Structure formats: structure tokens, C-alpha cells
Amino acid sequence: MKDKRKIQQLKLEQNQKKLRSQKQDLKQNKGKSKKDRSGLLDLIFRKEPKRYTVEDTIPYLRLLKSGICQIDEKHFNKSIAFEDINYQLALEEDRDLIFNQFANFLNSFDPSISIEFSYINQLGRNEEMKSAIQIPDKKDGFDDIRLEFREMLKSQIVKGNNGLKKSKYVTFTVEADNLEQATSKLERLEIDILSSLKSMGVRAESLNGEERLKVLHDVLNPNKTFEFSYKNLKKKESTKTYIAPDEFNFTPSRYFKFGKFIGAASHFQILASELSDRMLAEFLDIDDNINISFHIKAIEQSEAIKMVKRKNTDIDKMKIEENKKAVRSGYDMDILPSDLITYGEDVKSLLKDLQTRDERMFVVTIIFMNFAKTIQKLDNTISQISSIANKHNCKLKRLDHSQEQGLISVLPLGVNKIEIDRGLTSSSTAVFMPFTTEELFINSANSLYYGLNALSHNLIMADRKRLKNPNGLILGTPGSGKSFSAKREMANAILTTDDDVIICDPEGEYGNLVRQFKGEVIKVSSKSKDYLNPLDINMNYGDGDAPLKDKANFIMSMLELVVGGSGLTAEEKSVIDRCLPKIYEKYFENPKPCNMPILQNLYDMLKNQEEKVGKKLATEMEIYVTGSLNVFNHQSNVDLNKQLLCFDIKELGSQLKKIGMLVIQDQVWNKVSQNRGNKATRYYIDEFHLLLKDEQTASYSVEIWKRFRKWGGIPTGITQNVKDLLMSKEIENIFDNTDFVLMLNQASGDREILARKLKISQPQLKYVTNSNAGEGLLFFGNTIVPFLDKFPKDTILYQKMTTKPEEVR
């Protein structure tokens, strides 16, 4: 502020000198007319606007709660924040489509509208990321692991982009006589812009006043927390008070000071005849503080064509002059300077584009602003940007003596104070593609960690409960990290949420993790003393309206496996349906565990039926009731109320495997019914392809995939045998009801099948081709993100999750 006062004092002294000089001139011109003297007096005493405070640098009159900003008496604007989409990894035809859609989006703005695209990268501004990794303690005996998990997430952020926050905004400005007229124009424009972005698959939302002020505050105060509410705004108080830094000092010609930071504004000069659509992405990939603004204004089409025609005429004149020179000098008049020929061809091509190819002309100004705490650090970043610019045959030129104007022009306020522009067509402007790779970061209490984005190195945090179909698949070759990824999600869910987690474990490899979290490992085999009753039911079973009816469907599926062949006849189904209400009668009258029927009760009831088919069914059931496979003819004696349950079926044997897996699925359905409306139930099925091989288990699995989500169930199939999985008749139903796929390294044949099935592009496919463990593609709804996860090996969780014997300590 002292510097400001000194500057003001200096200006005052200069004005006083000018005044004395003007008075002297007045004395010397006494003979002039009154009119002349009056004009001179007006000149002397005319008041020039002066900047007295830091707020005067911020170029707006008022920013309303609605998000409308009034720049001056005639100009008003709004801002929209938009997210990234997959462009760099998309299929070639999809990239072309996105490019054309973006060019058409630019074409939709007429000359009365000014557009500013703002791209803001800021270090240390990712509050969302910080809050997402704050897993609260629960005092359940696992808080030491929660602490370890939080530290792991912090270390992953450091390995990645160090908490760099990347934001994208489009600010659109209109001219209007008053606020009412401006509001009407801006609202119509806002709807059109949101609709255009949505058609490109871009998530976008309009910013209200508070959100716009926060964006401005964070640019102008990189190390401060934004604290503002329109409720606390005093009458006649400006919102600028809450976003202005402590000071601005624009005295140096090449830098400026704001608060504790040093900034530098530069103009981006395009020298190349052709540009790459990767260039903007390369600038935004720099892990440092960068602000880039594109000010774009359309030129009236007829005026643009006239302008190009004039250029063409000028070139023709130059050619005639060159011809005359050639004749005078005695050489061939058809030989023209190569630059003139090239320039002429370019102008003709441009004219053709404007007249026949739906191209439009835009006036574009590109401003960069960087800041740091030291000049050395600032210069290093600017040097990085300059290197990229030079690589693309462009230049970054410092705005000497115009740093204040540069800063104003880079703020997302739609104000451009730099009168250096370049004429570009729609296609040339669209080359500055704002899209690179889609991020996946959902700030939710239920969000889980899935690694780092392989392109941007941003943390991937996602909540499957937000998906339309949270059902999932984890696919990968042996050694790709398939089981580890599943275990990491299970552990994360237990640490972060109250969800129940159930595992169907055909290889006995999840026991360590289950015991770490004091869960229950239930060994299901003919030798085991852990018993599951396939006739277990609760009052919420199935849809809850008719639990016995839903249970009957399961029992018939199980008996179809028992009888084999073509399954149950209509007569057999009728007999079973008649018996079931009778064996459950005692339980429904007094729902105690001891009154729950077992297979023996159904066996006895069938044996006593008059029809021969009843006795036939009883005979076919006999081995499972009184014979050697009677493991399922007992009351359940295991604790099914633990948060983490694991059904270990490694020793189940081939004769019992199908029935065993069906019984487990029914126990899971029981759990989902019981938890309905209270908490989610996550069900992980390893070697999932085995369930889809048999008609009954496949049919029951599809029912789970279709109906679980309604009651808070989240099933996940895990397999390494993609070919077997895709051979199932039911795979279409599985894929149609799956919005989450975690795909790790794939064998070549499987890779090709999945590429066709999931429409994976060649650039995306490389992330599942000979990739390292823990690397692959994550499909989350319509989002596809390449990921990598290097989980720290020196952690308790890693020891419990790894399947490599040499790593277990």
C-alpha cells in the first residue's frame, strides 16, 4: 500500500507540473476566442480516473448471487464449469466426432457474444481430494489400519500430481441495456451451452455468485481459504473486498506482485501454419500453477468473406507488381516468390472454407499467467511452457509494461485488455482442444480408491453406489493383480463404509484378509463342520412381498441340479410347491431359528405324497439328506451376522460344487434382503465363469445381477477366463447390467473379444497389453480411465492382500 501511495504522490506532482504549464500557455493565448478558452479550461480541469485500491484492478461493477456479473454499464456475463472427457484415448472416429462437435459449438456463437475459455491449474488447492482421503476412525479395532490407509493415499497423491487441481470454465458475455434484458439473454445462452456440452458427453454446471467468487479468490489468493456468504454482505459493500489480495504491485515491467506471490502474464503467439490438438494438453500436463485464457469473438460471416477477398485482391496486385518487375529485369514473369505463392494458396483455401465448408472466422487472444513464490521458480515454469510453444512453432511473449492488463485478461471474467489477436477459422480454433482424459473423482463418503489416472496421475476415487447398475466385473490374467484389486476394494469398503462384504472363495485365498478384519471364514465341504441350511428364510426374503414364493424359485433351481437331465417336470414342480408351505408353517407361526425347516423335512414331506413323482423326488434327494453328501441337511451353525463373510469352497468337491455355489448365492440373497434399506451388501464371486457354465447357477446369477441393486446389493464377478465367461448364453444379460469393469492385463485373444464387446480404442487397449500388475482400464458408467496402482509393500494390508508367498511376512 505504501508503494501505491508513492505512485499516487508522484502522479499528483506530475499533474501539478502539467497544470502550471497549461496555465502558462493560457497566458500566452489571451487573444483566443471564449470558445477556445472554454475548451482549454475543460482540458485543464478534466478529472482522470485513478486507481486507489487493489479492488480497482478487478474489472467488474457487481457480481450477483445468481452468478451474473456486470462488467460495465452495457456488458454482463455468466460462467459454466465443465469437466474433461476421453479425447486422446478415444477411437479415431470418436475423436473426429468430438472435434467436429467442438468446432460446431464454437460456430454457434454469433458476433454479439464474447467467449472466454479459462484453464486453471493450481497446486495445493484440491480441498476435495484432501477431504476424500480423511477416512474417519470408528474405534472398532481397525483404526491403525485406517491410519495406514490414509497415509498410503497421501503418498499416492505425492507420487502423482502433488494435489494439483485442474479446472475448466467457459464465460460468455452479452451486451444489454439493463440487468433484466441481460438475464433473459444469458439464461437462453446458458441452456444452449449446457445442451451442446452434454451432447459431447461433457458434464457441466453453471456457477452461482459464490462459486464464481471462489474461483476468482483462489486465483488471486493462492494460499488463502475463501470465506464468504451473500448473507453476510453489507449494504453498499463490494464482493471484491472478499476476493482481492493484500496488494498489487505492477511497477516491474515483466512481473507483478500480488500478496506473497510473483506473477507474470504472457501472450501466446501462433507462428505455425498447422497446429496439433495435443498442444493445449501438453501445457496443462505441467504440474505447476498455470492459468490460460482464450478470448474468442466471432466475425460476421459476410464481413469475414469480404476481408479475405480483399486479402486475395492485395495478393493479386502483388503478383502483378512481381510480373512487372520480372519483365523489366528480363526474367520469366511466371516465376514468383515462393512465399507469395504459398500465401495466395492459403488465402484461396480460406475463402473456399468460409464459402462452402461451414467454417467461420474468429478473433482469438491467448493469455498465459503463471505465479510462484520466487522469480527463479516462476522463470523455470515459463521456460517449460516456452519449450512446448517452440516445439509447436509458436512463441510465448512476455507482456512487458502490460502485466496488469494481462492479469485482468486471464481472470474468468470475460474481459480482454490485451489488443493482440489472431484471426482463426473454426477448425483452427477447435485445435485448442480442451479435452484430454476424463478424470474419475467422486467426493463421497462411500468413495473408494482405485489407483492413479495413468495419464494425469490424479487420484481415482469412485462410489459404485452412484452408478445406475453398480454390478461389476474384475478381469485379468494370472499375476495381473486381479485378486489384489478385489481385496483392496473389500478392505477399503470395510474401513470406509458400513457395508457388509461377502466372498465366494473357490481357491481359499481370502482367509488372511478376512481374519485381519475379524470376519468369518465358513468352510463349505462334505468334511466341514460349518453348516449352511439351504432352506433358511427371513421375512424380507426376495422382494419382501411374498418371501415363500421367492424361496420356492430357489428350491426348485436347487432340485433341478439334484435331478439333473432336463430338470423338473410340471408335475414335479406342482408337488414341491404344495409341500413347501407345509414345511415352513411352524417357522412362520413362531420364527425362531430352531423352527427353520431343513432338507430332511422336505424329503419326508415328498416321500409321503400320494403321487409317484413325490417319492421319485425324495429318492433323488436321498444322497443329500441321509447319504454321503448330506452337508446341507443341517441347521445353519455359523455366524452370518459378521460384516465380512467368506465362503471357502476349495474342498467342496465336484459333486457338491454346483449346489454349494447355489446355496451360497441364496445365503447372500438372504443377507441382501435383511440389509435392505439399511446398508449395502457387496458380494464378490471368484472364478465367476464357473457359475455361468451351468444353466441353473447361470440363471440364478442373472437374477442376482438384475435384482440385487434394488435392495442395495453390489455383486462383483472375478475371473481370468474371459473366453469361458463370454461363451455363456447369459453373458449379454450380465454385461447389460454391469456398469463397473476393472480390466487388468489380458491375453491377446481375450483382448480382441473385449475390445469389440466394450468398444475399446487401440490407444486404450495398450493399457491392458503386456501391462504390469495393478495396471489397466477402469470402466465406470460411461467413463473409461487408464489406471495404475503401486500399493506400498511395507504395510499391514499389503501383507494380508498379496497372493505371492515370498512377500508374506
Feature names for model-found ranges:
Residues N492-I502:
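Post-Walker A helix-loop "phosphate-sensing" segment adjacent to the P-loop in P-loop NTPases
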Residues K518-I522, E730-M743:
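A short helix-turn-beta junction within AAA+ P-loop NTPase domains corresponding to the substrate/partner-engaging
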Residues I85, E92-P111, Q122, E282-L284, ...:
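P-loop NTPase motor domains
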Residues K482:
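Conserved lysine of the Walker
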Residues L758-R809:
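Conserved P-loop NTPase
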Residues M1-T437:
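Extended, folded cores of ATP/NTP-driven motor/assembly subunits in large transport
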Residues S485:
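Hydrophobic positions on the alpha1 helix immediately C-terminal to the Walker A/P-loop
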Residues I474:
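Hydrophobic anchor at the beta1->P-loop junction of P-loop NTPases
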